[in-house]
């Protein structure tokens, strides 16, 4: 008799995706982050659903409803901090996942990579709108500053901003629509993640060597389910340490003050996971130029498959490109630090150098390194 998981229409889909899936035998712990991102999404949707039961998207009561969740709702403080820190965890896993994709040349799978970039944009939009909902000082001013950037778009900019705001400033209409979008987008992200997986399973996983692994495959279960389980245990240990011992470590103290349109905070800045892009935005004195650079800082990932010059896919045996990759990682960390600093010397010039370096490494230095390494193969 045939096993039920191989015949039942629904179980057959799960079986092909997570049980009998042929996987390369040599993929390392860096391949864990896909499943960890799935876990983060489940945590966010679940905790967000319970928060939405008590939250009111109204300028007069939003802040007090969040306070009510933390003080009066049973384990409300835990749900709220799990949701807030879950976003940080999501982005940590997301950036590591992208970093692994760049290092091992996973961007060669064009469809999977492009869906991944779309997922990154959707996640950033969701996180931004979620940050506005508690209606604290940094929520309000962050929303005002970031949405105002759209006014830099020629001709339609001002109309577009007022259309998004639902008025002439960030107000009740803005909060309401941001809540609606913040609620629906995670489900769209979940659907897109399914498409991401669908495209990945068309080609099969990449591996650290960057060479075809058709001759040496092993079933996903039990080998990689147990490996993923170890990643989940470690991630949860880190997550609950953050939530239970340092819940406000990654937040902004300004968000514990209710939103006040008449009082601007001295340093308006987004959450830590957007600081690198925010630093790139601020490093260009022109508003439109800054907005273009901001979008390109993420969209540049879509160019990677087209500017790949090396004959080897992975960076595992390419020392020059390895050096440039870690220089890029250091540069992104430097930009993250700069994004949280005030706009004054020496931070301005450091930010400008780091921003230039970010684009130069990806667009100029890495393709040149690939050509040099091709020549080295002949020596």
Swiss-Prot record:
Q: Where are the transmembrane segments?
A: 33-53, 77-98, 113-133, 178-198, 226-246, 288-308, 320-340, 347-367
Pfam families documented for this protein: Cytochrom_B_C (PF00032), Cytochrome_B (PF00033)
Q: Which UniProt keywords apply?
A: Electron transport, Heme, Iron, Membrane, Metal-binding, Mitochondrion, Mitochondrion inner membrane, Respiratory chain, Transmembrane, Transmembrane helix, Transport, Ubiquinone
Is NAD there in the keyword field? no
- Classify the main location: mitochondrion
Q: Name one GO biological process term.
A: mitochondrial electron transport, ubiquinol to cytochrome c
Q: Where in the cell is it found?
A: Mitochondrion inner membrane
* Cofactor(s) needed by this chain: heme b
Q: Which residues bind heme b b562?
A: 83, 182
Give the free-text miscellaneous remark of the entry. Heme 1 (or BL or b562) is low-potential and absorbs at about 562 nm, and heme 2 (or BH or b566) is high-potential and absorbs at about 566 nm.
Q: What does this protein do?
A: Component of the ubiquinol-cytochrome c reductase complex (complex III or cytochrome b-c1 complex) that is part of the mitochondrial respiratory chain. The b-c1 complex mediates electron transfer from ubiquinol to cytochrome c. Contributes to the generation of a proton gradient across the mitochondrial membrane that is then used for ATP synthesis.
How it assembles, according to the record, is:
The cytochrome bc1 complex contains 11 subunits: 3 respiratory subunits (MT-CYB, CYC1 and UQCRFS1), 2 core proteins (UQCRC1 and UQCRC2) and 6 low-molecular weight proteins (UQCRH/QCR6, UQCRB/QCR7, UQCRQ/QCR8, UQCR10/QCR9, UQCR11/QCR10 and a cleavage product of UQCRFS1). This cytochrome bc1 complex then forms a dimer.
Q: What is this protein called?
A: Cytochrome b
């Amino acid at each position: 008799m045939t096993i039920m998981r191989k015949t039942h229409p629904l179980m057959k889909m799960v079986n092909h995706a997570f049980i009998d899936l042929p996987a390369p035998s040599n993929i390392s712990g860096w391949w864990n982050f896909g499943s960890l991102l799935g876990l983060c999404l489940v945590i966010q949707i679940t905790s967000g659903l319970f928060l939405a039961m008590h939250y009111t998207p109204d300028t007069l009561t939003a802040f007090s409803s969040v306070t009510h969740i933390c003080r009066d709702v049973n384990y409300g403080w835990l749900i709220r901090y799990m949701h807030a820190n879950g976003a940080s965890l999501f982005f940590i896993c997301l950036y590591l996942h992208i970093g692994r994709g760049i290092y091992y040349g996973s961007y060669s799978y064009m469809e999977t990579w492009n869906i991944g970039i779309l997922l990154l944009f959707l996640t950033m939009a969701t996180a931004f709108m979620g940050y506005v909902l508690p209606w604290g000082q940094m929520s309000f001013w962050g929303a005002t500053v970031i949405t105002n950037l759209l006014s830099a778009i020629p001709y339609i900019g001002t109309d577009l901003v007022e259309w998004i705001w639902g008025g002439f400033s960030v107000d009740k209409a803005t909060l309401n629509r941001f809540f609606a979008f913040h609620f629906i987008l995670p489900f769209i992200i979940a659907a897109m993640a399914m498409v991401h997986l669908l495209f990945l399973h068309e080609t099969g996983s990449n591996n650290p060597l960057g060479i075809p692994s058709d001759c040496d495959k092993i079933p996903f279960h039990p080998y990689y389910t147990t490996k993923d389980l170890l990643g989940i245990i470690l991630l949860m240990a880190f997550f609950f340490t953050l939530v239970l011992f340092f819940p406000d470590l990654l937040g902004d103290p300004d968000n514990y003050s209710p939103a006040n349109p008449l009082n601007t905070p001295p340093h308006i800045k987004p959450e830590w996971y957007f600081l690198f892009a925010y630093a790139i935005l601020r490093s260009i004195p022109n508003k439109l130029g800054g907005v273009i650079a901001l979008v390109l800082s993420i969209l540049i990932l879509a160019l990677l498959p087209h500017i790949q010059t090396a004959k080897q896919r992975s960076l595992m045996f390419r020392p020059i490109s390895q050096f440039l990759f870690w220089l890029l990682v250091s540069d992104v960390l430097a930009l993250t630090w700069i994004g949280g600093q005030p706009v004054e010397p020496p931070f301005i010039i450091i930010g400008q150098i780091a921003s230039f370096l970010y684009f130069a490494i990806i667009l100029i230095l890495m393709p040149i390194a690939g050509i040099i390494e091709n020549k080295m193969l002949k020596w």
